[in-house]
Amino acid sequence: MRRAWTLAAFAVFLLSLPAAAFAQSIPTLTDLPTGPRPDSWHIWNGTAIGLNGPVFGDLIKIYRKMPWGEGTTLLTSDSHWRYGIHNTACAVFDRPAVLLGVSPLLILDVDVHYGPEIDYIYNNFSSLRDKYFPQHLPPSTGHTHIVQHAQANTVFKIGVGPVAALTLNDFDYFKNNEPYFNWDVATIIKEGFVFRSKTMLLFEFMKDWRFMLDYQNIRYFETGWRNESAGAGFLVMNPAWNHIMVISQLNYYIHNPDFKGLLFWSAVVMEWDFPDKR
């Protein structure tokens, strides 16, 4: 049972990168408004699964979207502030947070988050250099543990014709009073910064169907731990049905001390917008 829990819930670390930013990542240009736009409440949800390492998690964001300007040009057609809450969840931890963000131009999104990481399965260690096996961790302490967490993330996107490129970057800060296994990053950490980057090159070969090349890199600066992978996949959208987006990709580990070979990852994203009545 212990191993089953570990395998089933291990590391939504791959969920956080694309999910945190896809809400504004690939807009449908014909849907973008021009002229004054009303404020709105926006709900965004992404669920991911994966193998090697196992991934199963969900990220939900609920925020107030406050446009500014007339949206008279393509670059300013979705300029807005936003504030709200979001939560990353899986079987072993929750991470509720408040968020504040801005999208000054269509090509750029910036968000900051702050909130506790609540670990339901908590594994502590004597040092950052202890040896460990992610799928056979030592017994849990048996109690819920809270770790302080803050994050800033940016999304830069650009497209010409059927080709688009996205770069998603997360800067995380964790603070705990002892080394522990962080399920999100999937290694032992105590405090300090984690950098996560995901770069995608997309080619739309038919309407709302895109082929994708992907590279991602995760680093924990205190120990030099890193996770690099590259691969390819497909992204399919249907804006008319709650902006649903399905992503499936197969990556190869370039560098990871705990996992080798191929990584499969897939996610389903949907979003809803509720404009204020005028």
What are the functions of these language-model segments?
Residues 23-44, 105-207, 215, 224-241, ...:
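Outer-membrane pore/translocation modules
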Residues 1-8:
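Bacterial N-terminal signal peptides that target proteins for export
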Residues 8-18:
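Bacterial N-terminal signal peptides
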Residues 55-59, 218-220, 229:
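Generic detector of solvent-exposed, compositionally biased contiguous segments
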Residues 210:
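Conserved active-site beta-strand-loop modules that form the wall/rim of enzyme catalytic pockets
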Residues 23-73, 78-80, 84-88, 271-278:
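Short glycine/proline- and aromatic-enriched beta-strand/turn motifs that initiate or cap beta-hairpins
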